[in-house]
Amino acid sequence: MSNSRSILSQPEWRIVDQSSLGPTFHALQSFAMDDTLCTSIGNGKSAATMRSWVHHNTIVLGIQDSRLPHLEEGISFLKQHNFNVIVRNSGGLAVVLDEGVLNVSLLFQETEKGIDIDLGYDTMWHLIKEMLKDYDVTIEAKEIVGSYCPGSYDLSIRDQKFAGISQRRIRGGVAVQIYLCATGSGSERAALVRDFYNLAIQGEETRFTYPEIVPSTMASLSELLGETITVQDLMMRLLKTLQQFAPKLTPSQLTIDEIPLYETNLQRIIDRNNKALGLEK
């Protein structure tokens, strides 16, 4: 873990906290934010950045999900359950975001200290273990078969997944992103995605193999730790942990120079999302 510690050890972490913006903060804005910050960091115009974010009742689909044979029926089902639906601009499959899920992005220069793909994932895994080290639990990174959006860096306790990590690289910057299920029922979130896939596939043969979701493979941290641990609790732990690695944490929003790039990125992402969902005018 020494290399992941070295990435966390920065002279300064820029902190962009968007965890309490409420239901009007749209998930497409988040992806535009990370693309903008990645570009600034890649250009050497920004320090390494931690961005935290929460979105209310949103299902984030992957590109492969947009090719489901009965996608419209699946989306109608999700909307009936009061969920917004978007397609993200990177790989992976469907995930659930709501008020009980904290999302964290770590963004740093790609060239710095030779960051390969696994090292980016290891850095986030190490951060989460440090945040929760006072609990007597082992946090493993391995694929949890039966979970939604399964991957080799699923984070789990006793084989129940509470977090998933993804990674995006753009213009010399790296964004390592994680969703952390803090409160609520992990199995209920998983059941929602299972039912979405059932409606969107309807037993048809597909070129891509979609996950067969077993809701009991997923849980929230509150369920796994036996006590309520809220998004706000995780935010406090996150900031305290980053303070151990950096002498300076600097609260920030987008700079004047970053705002035009953000607006360009947001429009591009909106257009791509509409195309993926067949919403083009």
From Swiss-Prot:
UniProt keyword annotations, A-Z: Acyltransferase, Transferase
Active site feature: 149
Domain BPL/LPL catalytic: 44-250
GO terms of biological process kind: lipoate biosynthetic process; protein modification process
Pathway(s) per entry: Protein modification; protein lipoylation via endogenous pathway; protein N(6)-(lipoyl)lysine from octanoyl-[acyl-carrier-protein]
Top-level class of the enzyme under EC nomenclature: transferase
Annotated InterPro entries: aa-tRNA-synth_II/BPL/LPL (IPR045864), BPL_LPL_catalytic (IPR004143), LipL (IPR024897), Octanoyltrans_LipM/LipL (IPR050664)
Pfam families: LplA-B_cat (PF21948)
Lineage: superkingdom: Bacteria
Family, similarity comment: Belongs to the octanoyltransferase LipL family.
HAMAP family listed in its UniProt record: LipL
Function: Catalyzes the amidotransfer (transamidation) of the octanoyl moiety from octanoyl-GcvH to the lipoyl domain of the E2 subunit of lipoate-dependent enzymes.
Protein name, entry field: Octanoyl-[GcvH]:protein N-octanoyltransferase
Organism: Bacillus cereus (strain ATCC 14579 / DSM 31 / CCUG 7414 / JCM 2152 / NBRC 15305 / NCIMB 9373 / NCTC 2599 / NRRL B-3711)
Lineage per the UniProt record: Bacteria, Bacillati, Bacillota, Bacilli, Bacillales
Name of the coding gene: lipL
